[in-house]
Amino acid sequence: MSKSVFVGELTWKEYEARVAAGDCVLMLPVGALEQHGHHMCMNVDVLLPTAVCKRVAERIGALVMPGLQYGYKSQQKSGGGNHFPGTTSLDGATLTGTVQDIIRELARHGARRLVLMNGHYENSMFIVEGIDLALRELRYAGIQDFKVVVLSYWDFVKDPAVIQQLYPEGFLGWDIEHGGVFETSLMLALYPDLVDLDRVVDHPPATFPPYDVFPVDPARTPAPGTLSSAKTASREKGELILEVCVQGIADAIREEFPPT
């Protein structure tokens, strides 16, 4: 029998047996294909939540579904904007419908415990809408016990002491961390071959007005696409972030889905 935590690496009989046990937690990473500056690959928002899911699953005995590779449109003030070559996005209705369809299928399999791990800020409310529509559909079908936990891994990095270690020069806020120290450090810890620190563009933090304008003016986004400099990123910082996220998420899932 396969020992993999990835559903896609199991046979259907192995998967069926795990789900039939009744307390199996499934985890679904939801990412995006989005530029992350000159120094990192474009599938950061898929790679990172998938890696976190894998490590959490190994600690708690969960399974990881294949992640969603595409997400909602990159917004200028959180992801640099949807105008960059390579950034490939979904309409909100498409993402919502995909989440809804997957939940319905998992329920058909007999699963009742799901964790949706977001890796792309812009996905958030469309994931929630998909969950809401799916649970309503399941209730109409007589399924009342399907439970979903939705989270973003970065929300577990909140200890001021940890923030100080990551940003000793001062933390300017999550809203400009796209392609910055946080994501780059995690990538250095997990996928160092996909990071080239020599290509980091050291630029001042992006500044935006307290409102949005459409159509977007690309000139308001720093030229490399990152919203802050990643020059102080390091593998050590990434390892710290990873442990904080994995332990915090594992604890949260154990609390929400206690053993039966």
Curated annotation (Swiss-Prot):
Top-rank lineage group of the source organism: Bacteria
Cofactor info, note text: Binds 2 Zn(2+) ions or 1 Zn(2+) and 1 Mn(2+) per subunit. The Zn(2+) in the metal 1 binding site can be replaced with Mn(2+); however, the second zinc in metal binding site 2 is much more tightly bound and cannot be replaced. The enzyme with one zinc and one manganese ion is more active than that with two zinc ions.
Pfam families to which the protein is assigned, alphabetical: Creatininase
Enzyme class: hydrolase
InterPro entries associated with the record: Creatininase (IPR031034), Creatininase-like_sf (IPR024087), Creatininase/forma_Hydrolase (IPR003785)
Mechanisms controlling activity: Is markedly inactivated in vitro by heavy metal ions, N-bromosuccinimide, ethoxyformic anhydride, and dye-sensitized photooxidation.
Site feature Coordinates a catalytic water molecule, where: E122
pH effect summary: Optimum pH is 7-9 for the forward and reverse reactions.
Claim: Metal-binding is one of the keywords in the record: yes
Consequence of substituting W174F: 2-fold decrease in catalytic efficiency
GO biological process: creatine biosynthetic process; creatinine catabolic process; riboflavin biosynthetic process
Impact reported for W154A: Loss of activity
EC number: 3.5.2.10
Reaction catalysed by this enzyme: creatinine + H2O = creatine
GO MF assignments: creatininase activity; hydrolase activity, acting on carbon-nitrogen (but not peptide) bonds, in linear amides; manganese ion binding; zinc ion binding
Protein keywords: Hydrolase, Manganese, Metal-binding, Zinc
Outcome reported for the amino acid change (mutating Y121A): 30-fold decrease in catalytic efficiency
Temperature curve summary: Retains 75% of the activity after incubation at 75 degrees Celsius for 30 minutes.
Pathway connected to this protein: Amine and polyamine degradation; creatinine degradation
Family: Belongs to the creatininase superfamily.
Function of the molecule: Cyclic amidohydrolase that catalyzes the reversible conversion of creatinine to creatine. Is also active toward glycocyamidine, though the reaction rate is very low, but it is completely inert toward hydantoin and its derivatives.
Summary of subunit composition and partner proteins: Homohexamer; trimer of dimers.
NCBIfam families, sorted: creatininase (TIGR04448)
Name of the protein this chain belongs to: Creatinine amidohydrolase
Organism listed in the record: Pseudomonas putida
